[in-house]
Amino acid sequence: MIQVIQLKGKDKHLYQLLAPLVMDPDVIRANNNYPFKTSEDFVWYIAIDNRDVIGFIPVEQKSGKKAVINNYYVAAVDEKRKEILSLLLSSVVTAFIPAGWTLNSVTLIQDKEIFEKFEFVSMDKKWTRYVKMYR
């Protein structure tokens, strides 16, 4: 059974859970060779299945109740990817939207439909691999 946990950006447990993934060359390559970052302004949503991290969404909290989803990762494809990403997004939306936050996301084009199911809308900004969305 997949469990989603929430950790603050400087939580020691976050580093223990994510280090094997964020230092893996395949995972870094999947992130367009961009390093994963965190700070005290981040909240991380981590999907765990049988003690294995199978995905995560970092959310950076900015001023004015604006939050940004960027550099998320899901270790699956097709239907399993949709399932994991949906669980993660559900946790993020449940935590932020009722509290009055605006969510912006730099979304992989392949995941656009999943974000739309959670009422994210595309903005005019679009790159080769990503689309900017908000809710």
Model-derived features: where do they sit?
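Conserved acetyl-CoA-binding loop-helix of GNAT-fold acetyltransferases
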Residues: 80-94
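Conserved active-site alpha-helix within GNAT-family acetyltransferase domains
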Residues: 108-127
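Short amphipathic alpha-helix that is part of the acyltransferase structural core
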Residues: 1-31
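Conserved GNAT acetyl-CoA-binding A-motif
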Residues: 95-108
